[in-house]
A protein has these predicted regions:
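Conserved ABC ATPase "signature" region
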Residues: 96, 100, 107-125
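Hydrophobic anchor residue at the start of the ABC signature
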Residues: 143
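Conserved catalytic motifs of ABC-family nucleotide-binding domains
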Residues: 150
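Catalytic Walker B motif of ABC-type/P-loop ATPase nucleotide-binding domains
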Residues: 154-157
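ABC transporter nucleotide-binding domain
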Residues: 172-265
Length: 316
């Protein structure tokens, strides 16, 4: 669906994008993660046709973002981080105005607008003025507006920013529904815990470059691979410890009651073989798993390394 190659953008002396590469497959809900100033909003504005990069290639659905800009705007829905609404319009008028911008009028427009307002839980607000909506309602209204022409790719820049916890949960539920309907979504966000539950893939950007990209399964496999292995022993603990002390993948052992925590440098196959070895030795194992890591910890680890490299580069 989306391919970005060697994308660069400079604002004066500031290099916002420095050779960014990104791949988003059709039907994915892709989380675009990075600290403030990493280049997320600049990237999304280029995708939406609001900025022209200095160099690089961008294709969306096989169309070039430069030469096919007019057609691409019909295939993209864009929800910016700061959005404008027409406060003196009613919700239904607001939706029908944007429908008319895409040539959708009359009964078709009214039907389409009502369907989308139902999808974002605003069907009972059609006759309300936009000015009377809460911030969360306005953000849902802008999401409905971005969907009005049934885009192939939906781009959202910090969509949950400024929302209270309840409203954020409601908004996230709508995005999950769109994902389950097969929509391709590119979501920029700082709320990493929600992205880990919501997304099918993520990309982490730092200083204008992609530092990590992959499916959520791949990302969590990387997170958990360096975490301790936790084993609960029901019986034969001494026999289990003897096996663990002689195992080549075991680096450290910490025992607390029937719980054993291992520094284990092995992959999933090594874990399976160790478990089988314990069972074959008549050790009764009640639980055997890696300690779960978090997207936040991986993000901090990666971006800290990037900051160190940036300092070294500056000093050189």
């Amino acid at each position: 669906m989306l391919t970005i190659k060697n994308l660069r953008k400079r604002y004066g002396n500031f290099q916002a994008l420095d050779g960014l590469n990104l791949e988003v497959a059709d039907g994915e809900l892709f989380g675009f993660v990075g600290p403030n100033g990493a280049g997320k909003t600049t990237t999304l504005k280029i995708l939406a046709g609001l900025l022209v990069p200095d160099e690089g290639e961008v294709e969306i659905g096989g169309l070039d973002v430069y030469s096919d800009g007019k057609e691409l705007r019909r295939r993209i829905g864009y929800v910016p981080d700061f959005f404008g609404v027409y406060d003196n319009l009613k919700v239904s008028e607001y939706m029908e105005f944007f429908a008319s911008c895409y040539g959708i009028t009359g009964l078709q427009a009214r039907t389409r607008c009502h369907t989308l307002l139902e999808q974002v839980r605003l069907e009972d607000k059609e006759d309300f003025f936009v000015d009377g909506l809460s911030r969360g309602m306005k953000q849902r209204l802008c999401l409905a507006r971005a969907l009005i022409h049934d885009p192939d790719l939906l781009i959202l820049d910090e969509p949950a920013s400024g929302l209270d916890p309840r409203t954020r949960v409601e908004y996230t539920a709508i995005l999950k529904e769109l994902r389950d309907q097969g929509k391709t979504l590119l979501v920029s966000s700082h709320i990493l815990s929600e992205l880990s539950e919501l997304c099918t893939s993520i990309g982490i950007i730092e200083q204008g470059r992609t530092v990590l990209q992959g499916s959520m399964d791949q990302i969590f496999a990387r997170i958990n691979s360096s975490n301790p292995l936790l084993i609960s022993i029901f019986s034969q603990k001494e026999k289990a410890l003897a096996i663990l002390k002689s195992h080549p993948c075991v680096q450290t052992i910490a025992v607390q009651g029937d719980e054993i925590k291992l520094g284990f440098l092995g992959d999933r196959q090594d874990e399976a073989l160790l478990l089988q070895q314990l069972i074959d030795a008549d050790v009764m194992v009640s639980s055997f798993m890696r300690e779960k890591g978090s997207l936040e910890s991986l993000f901090m680890q990666i971006t800290e390394h990037e900051e160190e490299r940036a300092v070294l580069k500056h000093e050189m």
